[in-house]
């Protein structure tokens, strides 16, 4: 009887010892269920120049002549920007880093100027898979008289994105946690609150520090050049099917909640 009981107990030890953490696996962001910050974005394309009041750092009076203009600044992921006006309701943007495209973007409004669509192709710096995004906005502030219709104050409504830009893979082993994406962003960190490098794409100047908030919750703090950029509270549901990420972007002053589904 005792041997049978011992065998019964020992038979469960491998499963317990090697049980997956709630974070383990591949996750995909459900943009329909996510709640994005409603703080407005501000753009101006007027008198042959482009300005972005909501950008960090801010961008002012960039020539909109279709040629690469120097916009290098600490904290900016591209060093040149080319802005080309297509017509009264649309414009094209190309951001580059060291001559290589970071993104190519088209901005266009509805004929009545009430909605804005920004469609982008994004190119990771390490050559990882490029991916598309499309963001739709609703106007909350008028464009100045004579300005391109893409100007004004805009509130984000929804985002659609290629799977590569929405997917991440997580793995926890003891006090070690790793995250990677198809677009080349990855990190490995201990749950000790110390800073570890973020690799890939434009995140070469970023670090991440991670601490546990419980069996199903962690806090990840991203820093750029030593300054806190974003703090994320990440929690996996009790059934293990959903991961909620509350992202507090300290640089932009925006708080968004992302819902990821287990794949």
What kind of feature is each model-predicted range?
Residues 1-5:
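Positively charged n-region of N-terminal signal peptides that target proteins for export
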Residues 7-16:
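Bacterial N-terminal signal peptides
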Residues 20-263:
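Hydrophobic small-molecule pocket/channel-lining residues, especially in calycin-type beta-barrels
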